[in-house]
């Protein structure tokens, strides 16, 4: 039997989900399919890459870092969240994301974002998750709190 996980968005729900996914990794439970939006997608990629506790760390270790979130970011970049910090600095330098493990895992992964021109959901598969993590940036972008993401 094939198994799938659907991971919801939402900041606090995302922290809870990160813990559940860590328990799955500890218990050696590996889903065949993972789909997530927003925080669910961000946690889902860490789960698929097998990086236990990475989702929790990225949600808690940088919470008080002004580069992560805050008024300064909103004023300088018109985004409450420091998207470059979250999707470039953290995964490439501070808490490296294992792109190779993610792409080599046979688990299928998808995320979705809204195309602001059409209002339709656009889905991104694992093959579209590159080292710039733009698909994740798109799914986590919040109207009025962050800039829209031009992707493809």
Regions found by a protein language model. Give the residues of each.
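Patatin-like phospholipase
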Residues: 1-37, 45-152
